[in-house]
Amino acid sequence: MEKVGENVIKIFIDGVGNVYFNLQKYSTTISEEHKFIYYFDAEGRFMGGFFDGISYRRGLDNRLMKKFFDKDGFKVKVFVNDDEKKRIIEDVIERVSRIKNELIGHGFGSEVLNRINEILKWNYKKLEEEGIKFFSVYKPISILPPDQYFSLVLQAAEGCSWNKCTFCSFYQDRKFRIKNPDEFLNHIKKVKEFFGKAIGLRKSIFFR
């Protein structure tokens, strides 16, 4: 084991090569030879990765988006279907499990193993359940300003107070309603429970 950065550890693992662990306060990134990279939040939930020239990002609703350049050089963003999502997530978990077995076999006992154990709690089934739980905490978040993607969204109201723009259909499926104080406090409690330790990744608060 070699420390190669302030929070980065390098470990050589047979059959894999050099594996880098970036241990941040609220996230963990694992990189296999800088070719297969995947990262997780402080609770151990898979957040996304980069492999085979494709970037993946998992949303709080457990949808998985992939981004890549097509043969003409155009950037493509698309949500994968359930079969592909399951294959990717299970492959990541299998890789992490294999790394854990190698570390245990060589007598490693460290923060790296503690984080890996947290990651391995979140298999595909549990992440799917988390996606369902998301919709018990939030009404659909139709759109966010680009500078608020990493904010903690709190829904003090539902719908749009105007909702008459002919070019916008984001909130036509629901009436505008402001939550009363007790409702909003309960919403905040559910949000905090949902994010857990990973709430530290959120840079600001955005009220909807």
Give the location of each predicted region:
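N-terminal [4Fe-4S]-dependent radical SAM core
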Residues: 31, 36-58, 87, 91-154, ...
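Long terminal accessory regions outside catalytic cores
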Residues: 1-102
